């Protein structure tokens, strides 16, 4: 373990990268609050940021617009920093239906959700890392602006153990219970502990493969050991260890009882308001629901929907922002916002949608007004909490450019020498026939084609038409979930089909080097899908191929088209000039075709369990394909496999248990996307 970032990479910065890295680092160290990295597709933006992180040596939070991109970034940073703490913080819900009320039909929808335990463990690991290590890099989505337990409570509850320390066993058990760990003498699972004489085994909630053994003698801690909870194998001995709470929302018994009192006061005030407005049904509903929750909290310290009382549990004033992941960041941290033109508008939108739903619940007596404070951060609150930031995008929005005040660092020249695709404009009248002839040319070369249309109906009709003419074509639409979307892109790269048709094929950040042609139908129809940024992003999908070309079908030149073409020409000019000056011959990007989550798969446990196997053993083992499974199926399969694994371990069949653990690891990784 080290407290310094150590970048591991087989190559060194090239093209525009060295100058960009130097400028970003100099601006950061000069105290510049906001700056923008404008990097074209395939210019190595992630590698550039990794170099910046290594040079500034600050804890880093990287925000991505969706789970798919966050997973890809997590895998890439994990490979760049194998000796450091690279963590993953996204929503842990596989499925989430928030509670809501529809007044027009008098329908109340109960909250329903399914939590992914593996992602919950990774979230806990992320916050622990931020609080305990300087070499921490966390990749997150907008989940980072949603309410979390206060870091002060999280830290005050932790259990610090040292060899030689005097501690009463009953006191130790009580402290673990306060951390919401459960006692289980039969099997040691994550977030549980067991007692055997003067030996306590604890499986930390944020750990995936290591458990802690505390050996006491006459009230003193004699030995602290990390061991494999599955096989019992000793991993290493420790002098000191800190056990963190099982959940971010853990709190003391005193704080819970204090919250019960303040909730009662708020309930009394709210009921008086409702009675004064003659809202008798709402008052009765609120009293009944809240009293039930209060009884649960007083008896067991928890209730369904306890997050709606988070203001009382954290001691915040009405209207104050909730604690979030940003409260866990040290003040000197670095914030990187990837694909900022998408991520920043998302941050602003989260609060408004949440607020309107909650106001209805409060108005009709389903929740107390304090439930409104269980919310994501407002945009201005997020701005106030953000440390020094780098916005990363091929098409930065007006907000990023304004905030950066002209500090825009360009990554236009690619290390591979590739230049931006040639952009051609052709008439709309014969666009489908012209497109078909272009597709046939590309198929002969073994390349792939992306086609983007304006409407779902047009995409469906075009897919059907191309299919009838013998072209292997697929259609990407909004009903396809994230995992299946990634699979379709992977199949396109593998050559299982040649043409992918869709409405919005920007898919920022996804690599498809085999695509040499991007066709944009009806490019002259101004709007969101044909804005300057959208056109540049879509054209960029062909930028990783030596034969890259973009065809815009249009009968007139719009301002967006002109701006996109001008920017593309400017970049090409700079790239060609650089290549001639340095004698560089452009080469297509060679990227192995693998699962987008591959980088995240290769954690220590999987590497360790795979090292000692013979080839014959690997062939004989069944390796099921989990990628096509839906989240609910994955959750069910996980539970079934875990039960089998623990049963094998209980029967001392450690080899069989280890094999199942490998399957679980693959399955958990499949669920990340």
From Swiss-Prot:
PROSITE patterns: HELICASE_ATP_BIND_1 (PS51192), HELICASE_CTER (PS51194), UVR (PS50151)
Family annotation (CDD domains): DEXHc_UvrB (cd17916), SF2_C_UvrB (cd18790)
The Helicase C-terminal domain, residue ranges: 431-597
Protein name stated in the entry: UvrABC system protein B
Segments of this protein annotated with the region Disordered: 601-631
Compartments (UniProt record): Cytoplasm
Domain of life, source organism: Bacteria
């Amino acid at each position: 373990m080290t407290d310094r970032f150590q970048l591991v990479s087989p190559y060194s910065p090239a093209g525009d990268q060295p100058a960009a890295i130097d400028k970003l680092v100099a601006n950061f160290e000069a105290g510049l609050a906001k700056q923008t990295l404008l990097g074209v597709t395939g210019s190595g933006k992630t590698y550039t940021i990794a170099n910046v992180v290594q040079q500034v040596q600050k804890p880093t939070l990287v925000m991505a617009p969706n789970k798919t991109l966050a997973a890809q970034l997590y895998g890439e940073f994990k490979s760049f920093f194998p000796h450091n703490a690279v963590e993953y913080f996204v929503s842990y819900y596989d499925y989430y239906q928030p509670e809501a009320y529809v007044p027009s039909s008098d329908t109340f929808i109960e909250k329903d959700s399914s939590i992914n335990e593996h992602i919950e463990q990774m979230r806990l690991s992320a916050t622990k890392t931020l609080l305990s290590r300087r070499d921490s890099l966390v990749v997150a989505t907008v989940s980072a602006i949603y309410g979390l337990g206060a870091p002060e409570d999280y830290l005050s509850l932790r259990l610090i153990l040292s060899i030689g320390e005097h501690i009463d066993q009953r006191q130790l058990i009580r402290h673990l219970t306060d951390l919401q760990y459960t006692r289980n003498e039969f099997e040691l699972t994550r977030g549980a502990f067991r007692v055997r004489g003067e030996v306590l085994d604890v499986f930390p909630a944020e750990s995936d493969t290591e458990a802690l053994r505390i050996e006491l003698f006459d009230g003193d801690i004699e030995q602290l050991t990390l061991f494999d909870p599955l096989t019992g194998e000793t991993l290493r001995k420790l002098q000191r260890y800190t056990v963190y709470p099982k959940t971010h929302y853990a709190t003391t018994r005193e704080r819970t009882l204090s919250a019960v009192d303040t909730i009662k006061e708020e309930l009394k005030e709210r009921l008086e308001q409702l009675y004064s407005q003659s809202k008798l049904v709402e008052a009765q509903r609120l009293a009944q629901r809240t009293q039930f929750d209060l009884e649960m909290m007083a008896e067991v310290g928890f209730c369904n929907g306890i997050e709606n009382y988070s203001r009382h549990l954290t001691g915040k004033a009405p209207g104050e922002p909730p604690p979030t992941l940003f409260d866990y960041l040290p003040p000197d941290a670095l914030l990187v916002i990837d694909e900022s033109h998408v991520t920043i508008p998302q941050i602003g939108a989260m609060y408004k949608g949440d607020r309107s739903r909650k106001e209805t619940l409060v108005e009709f007596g389903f929740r107390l007004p304090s439930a409104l404070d269980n919310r994501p951060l407002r945009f201005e609150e997020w701005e106030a909490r953000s440390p020094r930031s780098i916005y990363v995008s091929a098409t930065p929005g007006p907000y990023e450019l304004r905030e950066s005040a002209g500090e825009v660092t360009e990554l236009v020249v690619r290390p591979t020498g590739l230049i931006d695709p040639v952009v051609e404009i052709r008439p709309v009248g014969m666009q489908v026939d012209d497109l078909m002839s272009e597709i046939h040319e590309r198929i002969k070369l073994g390349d792939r084609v992306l086609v983007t249309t304006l409407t779902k109906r047009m995409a469906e009709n075009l897919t059907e038409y191309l299919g009838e003419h013998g072209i292997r074509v697929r259609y990407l639409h909004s009903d396809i979930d994230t995992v299946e979307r990634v699979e379709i892109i992977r199949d396109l790269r593998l050559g299982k089909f040649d043409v992918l048709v869709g409405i919005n094929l920007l898919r920022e950040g996804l690599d498809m080097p085999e695509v040499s042609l991007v066709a944009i139908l009806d490019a002259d129809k101004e709007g969101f899908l044909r804005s300057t940024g959208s056109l540049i992003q879509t054209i960029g999908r062909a930028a990783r191929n030596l034969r890259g070309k973009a065809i815009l079908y249009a009968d007139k030149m719009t301002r967006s088209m002109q701006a996109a073409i001008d920017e593309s020409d400017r970049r090409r000019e700079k790239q060609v000039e650089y290549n001639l000056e340095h004698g560089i011959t452009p080469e297509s990007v060679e990227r192995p075709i693998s699962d987008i989550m591959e980088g995240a798969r290769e954690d220590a446990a999987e590497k360790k369990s795979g090292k000692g196997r013979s080839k014959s053993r690997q062939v004989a083992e069944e390796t099921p394909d989990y990628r096509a499974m839906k989240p609910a199926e994955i959750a069910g399969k996980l539970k079934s496999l875990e039960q089998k694994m623990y049963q094998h371990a209980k029967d001392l069949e450690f080899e069989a248990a280890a094999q199942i653990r490998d399957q679980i690891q693959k399955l958990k990784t499949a669920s990340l996307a």
